[in-house]
């Protein structure tokens, strides 16, 4: 079959069946294309769209150190953590971190997210119940908000007075797809793709789908078609002048699990990315300590490399 004769979806339906929840259907697609598109869009929405979320919580300036500690409200420490973690948050462009603070004192009252003090550039997009405060003793809750992409597991449960949380940065909280049969004229061997998307409200479902499709399109834009390849049109390898060691993955340094996880948390994948970081930049990474720094410096030294190295013409899209 000629490529120009492949079907494209012309029947597109959008069903916003609940708040921040939409079902999209696309038909008709060639057999197998529905699954290919559905899987790619799902994975991209869940793991490749940037967002912000609560990553750690401190209660009473770090004096509350256990989930079993007693606090002056009806909820447990675990309840408070879950409620604060569920806050849908956004950070303004150029703002990478923020802080949410609740300072409670006085009489009994129910506390909602609208009563929080927010750092500059931070916003909570929906009202969320936090706790039923019993009055009397003071209660202070501080939450750190960060930007990121995908999922980042917490390396510890509690450190330096903070409860550390698994971070899910994507504004898409659920995405799944289903493939059904479709027909066009006499052809019955076609696909209908149904995508079910739910977001936390920071972006709407249509915007999330558009972002995912655009990301996939950008990943594919440098792949030329067969005719262009036959004409001898090739994309120059941007890594041809770079030391091959720098293009290896950091896993090949055989670091301890703790050091490896710290590098993953800040999206350092290649040795070349690592050596361009300074000691101070690495020490600012979550859970990154001097022991990990020493280990990394020793491993790099064995290869004749060091931190703080400037690499000219380092490709930004490896």
Curated annotation (Swiss-Prot):
GO terms (BP aspect): DNA-templated transcription
Residue numbers spanned by region Alpha C-terminal domain (alpha-CTD): 242-318
Enzyme class: transferase
Region (Alpha N-terminal domain (alpha-NTD)): 1-227
InterPro entries on file: DNA-dir_RNA_pol_insert, DNA-dir_RNA_pol_RpoA/D/Rpb3, DNA-dir_RpoA, RBP11-like, RNAP_asu_C, RNApol_insert_sf
MF-aspect GO terms: DNA binding; DNA-directed RNA polymerase activity; protein dimerization activity
EC number: 2.7.7.6
Catalytic activity: RNA(n) + a ribonucleoside 5'-triphosphate = RNA(n+1) + diphosphate
Keywords: DNA-directed RNA polymerase, Nucleotidyltransferase, Transcription, Transferase
Similarity remark: Belongs to the RNA polymerase alpha chain family.
Quaternary structure note: Homodimer. The RNAP catalytic core consists of 2 alpha, 1 beta, 1 beta' and 1 omega subunit. When a sigma factor is associated with the core the holoenzyme is formed, which can initiate transcription.
Purpose of the protein: DNA-dependent RNA polymerase catalyzes the transcription of DNA into RNA using the four ribonucleoside triphosphates as substrates.
Free-text comment on this protein's domains from its UniProt entry: The N-terminal domain is essential for RNAP assembly and basal transcription, whereas the C-terminal domain is involved in interaction with transcriptional regulators and with upstream promoter elements.
Name of this protein: DNA-directed RNA polymerase subunit alpha 2
């Amino acid at each position: 079959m000629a490529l120009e004769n492949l079907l494209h979806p012309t029947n597109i339906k959008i069903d916003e069946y609940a708040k921040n929840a939409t079902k999209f259907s696309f038909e008709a697609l060639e057999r197998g294309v529905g699954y290919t598109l559905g899987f790619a869009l799902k994975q991209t929405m869940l793991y490749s769209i940037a967002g912000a979320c609560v990553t750690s919580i401190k209660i009473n300036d770090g004096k509350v150190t256990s989930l079993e500690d007693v606090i002056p409200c009806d909820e447990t420490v675990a309840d408070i953590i879950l409620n604060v973690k569920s806050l849908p948050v956004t950070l303004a462009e150029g703002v990478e971190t923020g802080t949410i603070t609740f300072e409670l004192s006085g009489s009994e009252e129910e506390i909602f997210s609208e009563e929080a003090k927010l750092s500059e550039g931070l916003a909570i997009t929906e009202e969320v119940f936090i706790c039923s405060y019993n009055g009397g003793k003071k209660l202070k809750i501080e939450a750190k908000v960060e930007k990121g992409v995908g999922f980042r597991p917490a390396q510890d449960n509690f450190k330096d007075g903070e409860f550390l949380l698994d971070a899910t940065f994507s504004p898409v909280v659920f995405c799944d797809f289903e493939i059904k049969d479709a027909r066009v004229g006499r052809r019955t061997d076609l696909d209908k793709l149904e995508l079910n998307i739910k977001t936390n409200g920071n972006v709407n479902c249509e915007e999330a789908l558009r972002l995912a499709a655009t990301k996939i399109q950008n990943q594919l834009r440098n792949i030329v078609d067969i005719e262009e390849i036959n004409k001898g049109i090739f994309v120059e390898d941007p890594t041809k002048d770079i030391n091959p060691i720098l293009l290896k993955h950091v896993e090949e340094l055989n670091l301890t699990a703790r050091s490896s996880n710290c590098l993953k948390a800040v999206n350092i994948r290649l040795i070349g990315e690592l050596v361009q970081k300074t000691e101070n930049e690495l020490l600012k990474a979550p859970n990154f300590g001097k022991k990990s720094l020493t280990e990394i410096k020793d491993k790099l030294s064995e290869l004749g490399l060091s931190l703080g190295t400037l690499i000219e013409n380092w490709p930004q899209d490896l």
